[in-house]
Amino acid sequence: MRTAMAKSLGAAAFLGAALFAHTLAAQTATCSYNITNEWNTGYTGDITITNRGSSAINGWSVNWQYATNRLSSSWNANVSGSNPYSASNLSWNGNIQPGQSVSFGFQVNKNGGSAERPSVGGSICSGSVASSSAPASSVPSSIASSSPSSVASSVISSMASSSPVSSSSVASSTPGSSSGNQQCNWYGTLYPLCVTTTNGWGWEDQRSCIARSTCAAQPAPFGIVGSGSSTPVSSSSSSLSSSSVVSSIRSSSSSSSSSVATGNGLASLADFPIGVAVAASGGNADIFTSSARQNIVRAEFNQITAENIMKMSYMYSGSNFSFTNSDRLVSWAAQNGQTVHGHALVWHPSYQLPNWASDSNANFRQDFARHIDTVAAHFAGQVKSWDVVNEALFDSADDPDGRGSANGYRQSVFYRQFGGPEYIDEAFRRARAADPTAELYYNDFNTEENGAKTTALVNLVQRLLNNGVPIDGVGFQMHVMNDYPSIANIRQAMQKIVALSPTLKIKITELDVRLNNPYDGNSSNDYTNRNDCAVSCAGLDRQKARYKEIVQAYLEVVPPGRRGGITVWGIADPDSWLYTHQNLPDWPLLFNDNLQPKPAYQGVVEALSGR
């Protein structure tokens, strides 16, 4: 079973382990190898290196060799060679504390043979766990059962699996760090201290770190450890309750954010996930490089959704799986008190499709199954919930090929290859088999209008329920305007889904509220200049009321045990896909261009607080 720390490092491992000679003294590790998903021509697998010694391992390398199989891709390691192969750690996963693990993954071409399981070599591996394999469409039980189901349990699990750290292990800090031999004992788990970041969490040397001031602000016995500090890592930290840990993390994170006046955070006002979509593909809004946005996420939210990098095409490099970018984001989430809502396993736009998803592919169904099996299994235990299928219903406003409706369904490449909507059933069944613990959602837009598309949604969900398909919830994207649709229709649309099953969850997945309505035929109402609502305008006041009434409707219509959460589709206005829409500026989110909370933010606070 993998430790919580292994997951936070972004796991899925490789084959064969040997560590650099200068770190070998008094260090032992077990190296376990698994085939996680196998198909006719290849497979994906992983190996995990677990430090069983008493001192930290600081830097590792691995090597292995096949008979006929050949490596086609890998992630979370630097790989070289063409059989034999060698791999070494990246900058962020080279340090393995006692009792902790790191791992990286691979995809292999069988080259006409069977799946090989080469010997695990290397002097660091004192014990090699026998190789195991998972047949096609299955997932290792160690992956499926080892994951915490909430932020709190993730933190507790991480603390429970961390051994008390000796001075020798503390001394092995990252090379190049001006922190010397010091690290941060963050509620029972060791993290690097930041060099340049002065508040909160940072991203330096390709990994997360904690600012000295934030680390030192924790209550005893936590804080800075190592040379110059006598604060130990106490094994008793595992006895902390989940509520006290989450409360402490929120308190510390909130105090580091200069852009949020309340200091409490939206997530502290709800007993269900309050999430936000984050960009992770470069630019000013990139969560990895914008410390101000990181502060907002830590202070306000407890769940993130990737805007793009967990969509279908982003899981590949050419025809091979590649999880490096998505693993980095999932790791960041785990290290920053966030769960992850995966978006999305299946989505139709041509610009978001992998190479295999075409009408001409004779092996389409096999590749479809391999995609669901591999991606869902890879993130098993790390992703709390998935949009399994996104936007499978027809919408006249989004029909670029002019194919029209097929009994309410979009005639996507998936629909065409399967000859109907059964691909939806298949996707849910395979996702459940690959990750039994994740919540599985169907997600779509304009379904809150309570019109024909809402009826199509009801029919789709009812069909899935009748067929025993393992659907856990329905996502309403909720891209709305200040004046459309009516709150009465939003309520009725959600109520129709609530009525379908006593266990079905409802999640608002992509909430934003436009001030301008380009469809109302009255341009005199439009705000046309970027400065019109930069600070204040009547539209911002209406937007506050709109956010408030939507959250209130959600709380009143959806029973407490069936609230999957509310996610806002972006952190600040300039991050939004609607910042300029149909030649009009807009201000659709909770924070403005200066990353300050808007009236809309207060509207959400009031709704969650019952005011």
Swiss-Prot record:
Cite the CBM2 domain residue spans from the record. Answer: 27-128
Q: Where are the transmembrane segments?
A: none
Q: Which UniProt keywords apply?
A: Carbohydrate metabolism, Disulfide bond, Glycosidase, Hydrolase, Polysaccharide degradation, Signal, Xylan degradation
Could you provide one GO biological process annotation from this protein's UniProt record?
xylan catabolic process
- Keyword Disulfide bond tagged: yes
Catalytic residues per the record? E391, E510
Signal sequence span is: 1-26
Coiled-coil annotated residue ranges, if any: none
Entry EC number(s) = 3.2.1.8
Q: In which pathway does it act?
A: Glycan degradation; xylan degradation
Domain CBM10, chain residue ranges per copy: 183-212
What domain of life does the UniProt record list for this protein's source?
Bacteria
Q: Tell me the ranges covered by the GH10 domain, including all copies.
A: 281-607
Q: What is this enzyme's catalytic activity, as reactions?
A: Endohydrolysis of (1->4)-beta-D-xylosidic linkages in xylans
Disulfide-bonded cysteines: C31-C125, C184-C215, C194-C209
An MF annotation (GO) of this entry: endo-1,4-beta-xylanase activity
Task: Write down the InterPro entries for this protein, in alphabetical order.
Answer: CBD2, CBM10, CBM10/Dockerin_dom, CBM10_sf, CBM2/CBM3_carb-bd_dom_sf, CBM2_carb-bd_dom_sf, CBM2_CS, GH10
The record's similarity note reads: Belongs to the glycosyl hydrolase 10 (cellulase F) family.
Spell out the protein name for this chain: Endo-1,4-beta-xylanase A
Give the originating organism: Cellvibrio japonicus (strain Ueda107) (Pseudomonas fluorescens subsp. cellulosa)
